[in-house]
Design a protein with these regions (language model features):
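Glycine-rich phosphate/pyrophosphate-handling loop used in enzymes and phosphotransfer proteins
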Residues: 1-149
């Protein structure tokens, strides 16, 4: 009996979501293509083709050199390469200025899956978010790097 109720509930929710997609189509946060049912925030093409930094496990990478002498850092890396007017900028703007916390969490999960397969990371145990200035936190309502981490 429980299985039948669950089936009908899922079917009903699927129909409701399909109807809502006609009125409010879900779009990729990077390229604005329509999303398939199994895609959440990014289409599969963007999920695999957003430009990665490739800094993982690389000593004295560009990001570490930026921090050198300013703050004590054991290692630094980044997930994506930012280019003005690029798809990464569009994604980051949706997170920062449109409050898309779910998108930040999705990117964090993507990065976590990629990091899990990296043997060269050694003793990496956590990702630490960059603190956000209280004024910016009040403006945006959340720390986007914390949602990512």
């Amino acid at each position: 009996m429980y299985a039948q109720i669950t089936y009908f509930y899922r079917r009903k929710m699927s129909l409701i979501n399909d109807f809502l997609s006609l009125i409010y189509p879900r779009q990729c946060s990077a390229c604005n293509r329509l999303l398939y049912a199994h895609e959440t925030h990014l289409c599969n093409l963007c999920a695999v083709s957003l430009p990665r930094s490739g800094f993982e496990g690389q000593r004295n990478n560009e990001l570490e050199l930026i921090f050198a002498g300013r703050v004590p850092v054991e290692a630094a890396t980044s997930f994506l390469l930012f280019e003005k007017t690029g798809r990464v900028q569009q994604v980051l703007h949706k997170i920062k200025y449109h409050g898309d916390k779910d998108l930040a969490q999705e990117l964090g999960k993507m990065y976590g899956r990629e990091l899990a397969g990296q043997a060269s990371l050694g003793e990496l145990h956590m990702i630490i978010p960059v603190p956000l200035h209280p004024k910016k936190l009040k403006e945006r309502g959340f720390n986007q790097s914390e949602a990512f981490a």
